[in-house]
């Protein structure tokens, strides 16, 4: 499910954002994963609310998971530089809980939200998707305020029931 060594740069703005990765690094523990920007991190949370608080030396997250996105608050703009093996998007399904999720975007190229979520839309199983700024994708209203999903970003997604999101390849 993974390919040879590759790299990814994830740019984080000051304040709150949501990030994800398509790279499996040698050490996926959140402390090692974010070691290059440690001094700029205030808080990292997963969709369950489990947190990493560097100032308190508290790691309730453990390892970064390829299928999840993470909310992060930084005290300045910074960049996560990663090297590792690439998760092929079409071979790594995203398992969704009923209700709210924070998902990763595993493709290297941007793709319109309506195409990414097409199967969920056809099943009537997507309520809303939001980016880090709160821009929404509302299929019931045929509204796409997100535009394209972007590599390195994470997205909040609300479903009616548990499901699986399958990404297309980058081709």
What are these regions (language model features)?
Residues 1-171:
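N-terminal exported-region signature
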């Amino acid at each position: 499910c993974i390919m040879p060594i590759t790299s990814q740069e994830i740019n984080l703005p000051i304040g709150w954002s949501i990030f994800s990765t398509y790279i499996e690094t040698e050490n996926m523990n959140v402390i090692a994963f974010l070691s290059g920007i440690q001094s700029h991190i205030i808080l990292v949370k997963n969709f369950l609310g489990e947190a990493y608080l560097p100032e308190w030396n508290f790691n309730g997250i453990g390892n970064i998971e390829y299928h999840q996105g993470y909310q992060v608050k930084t005290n300045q703009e910074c960049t996560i530089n990663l090297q590792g093996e690439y998760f092929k998007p079409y071979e790594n399904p995203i398992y969704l809980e009923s209700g709210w999720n924070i998902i990763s975007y595993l493709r290297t190229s941007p793709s319109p939200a309506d195409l990414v979520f097409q199967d969920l839309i056809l099943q009537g199983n997507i309520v809303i998707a939001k980016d880090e700024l709160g821009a929404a994708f509302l299929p019931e209203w045929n509204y796409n305020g997100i535009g394209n999903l972007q590599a390195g970003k994470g997205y909040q997604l609300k479903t009616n029931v548990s499901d699986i999101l399958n990404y297309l390849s980058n081709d």
